[in-house]
Regions:
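Short glycine-aspartate micro-motif
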Residues: 1-3, 64
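Extended, folded domain segments that form the structural surfaces/walls around functional sites
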Residues: 3, 314, 350-352
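Short glycine/serine/threonine-rich phosphate/pyrophosphate-binding segments
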Residues: 4-10
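Helical "lid/coupling" subdomains associated with nucleotide-phosphate turnover
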Residues: 13-304, 309-322, 330, 335, ...
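C-terminal accessory domains/tails appended to large, multi-domain proteins
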Residues: 336-340, 346-349
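A short amphipathic beta-strand at an alpha->beta junction
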Residues: 347-357
Length: 357
């Protein structure tokens, strides 16, 4: 983790939720602006301090987290250069090559123009050129596999410091979704039942995918107040632009697209198509399947989860079976049958329905 302020820069190694080796250096852009010798003098000062830092924290780490306003300003400029369609800074990812390209791009462009394009304050933009020099040389020396941006700062850190360990261990994404469900859903608590209902479709899913499925189930009904013609758009906006933690950009779009398909079969023609480029073909398909599964499962919004029935997914035989209990047979009408077959079709499967006696 690298936190930059006006006068100093701190590095700390984070592993297994614990802070390891850490080091500080006078590499803040405000201080470096006053170094004698111009750019050549700054380069020597930066390299001298980076030598000390690298000796302590090492190189070749999996990820470098950037904290601080100057880093966020550079990340926003990276978005502008790359024409990224999703302007959410938290968990924004960059490669070392992208950082180098952006630093050069900043140097080659007019700062006043860039400030207007990114809505960056004059005071913040004035520090970007020097901060860019530090970041470029820092990335070159540390050689991280990727760079991630944190929108959090000292306020969030102080709050986290006050939390008991049992709260710290919770998933920030799931907790935020639970809160949204409790506050806005028509039937708070049904998201858990819906997740259990869909679980057979994800018997072999990795934990990272399961948490997105769970998050989607918790959020599946929180935008019910929106007009039906626009509900799918509100769902997508809610997931991709809300203040949710623990999500990469591609995960935000996956979650948003799944919720879009919760209310709408087709995504073609929507204003969100540029964002779909953040997902590959398989991810687009998986999000559609999840959305259609929630669309079907939501028809069994009952207080008693045992009345929902159960699905069985046979991926080898490509057969999806729905067992409808006697108490819920009236719920499985023409619309439910159509939604079930739509889900089976998305899976490339044959859909069979069994009515229990």
């Amino acid at each position: 983790l690298c936190d930059i302020g006006g006068s100093s820069m701190e590095l700390a190694v984070i592993a297994d939720g614990k802070v390891g080796k850490r080091m500080t250096a006078p590499l803040g852009p405000l201080r470096l602006e006053g170094i004698k010798g111009g750019k050549k003098g700054r380069k020597a000062e930066i390299d001298r301090n980076l030598d000390r830092l690298v000796d302590v924290v090492g190189t070749g780490h999996k990820r470098l987290f950037l904290v601080g306003g100057s880093w966020r300003a550079i990340a926003r400029l990276d978005m502008e250069r790359r024409e990224d369609p999703l302007h959410v800074l938290h968990e924004y990812r960059m490669t070392p090559r992208s950082v180098v390209a952006t630093v050069k791009w900043i140097a080659d462009n007019d700062l006043t123009e860039l400030r207007g394009r990114t809505d960056t304050s004059e005071a913040r933009m004035s520090l970007v050129p020097v901060a860019s020099e530090v970041l470029r040389r820092l990335v070159r020396r540390l050689r991280p596999a990727e760079i991630a941006v944190s929108a959090y700062g000292i306020r969030e850190g102080m709050l986290y410091e006050q939390m008991p360990d049992r709260l710290r261990r919770r998933d920030p994404l799931i907790e935020a979704c639970r809160f949204a469900e409790a506050k806005d859903a028509r039937m708070p608590g049904f998201g858990k039942a819906l997740f259990g209902f869909l679980r057979p479709l994800y018997a072999n899913a990795r934990p990272a995918r399961l948490r997105l499925v769970k998050a989607a189930c918790l959020l599946h009904d929180v935008t019910w107040r929106a007009h039906p013609d626009y509900r799918h758009e509100v769902c997508f906006d809610n997931a991709t632009r809300a203040n949710l933690g623990g999500l990469t950009h591609s995960e935000r779009v996956f979650l948003g697209l799944a919720l879009l398909h919760r209310y709408k079969n087709s995504r073609s023609g929507t204003r969100f198509e540029p964002l779909m480029e953040l997902l590959n073909a398989q991810q687009l398909k998986d999000a559609e399947i999840l959305g259609k599964a929630m669309r079907f499962g939501a028809m069994f919004s009952v207080q008693d989860s045992s009345m929902m029935g159960a699905m069985t997914w046979k991926p080898v035989k490509k057969v999806l079976v729905m067992q409808v209990p006697k108490a819920s047979r009236a719920l499985f009408g023409e619309v439910a049958a159509a939604r079930f077959q739509s889900l089976a079709s998305s899976l490339g499967a044959e859909g069979n329905v069994t009515f229990l006696k």
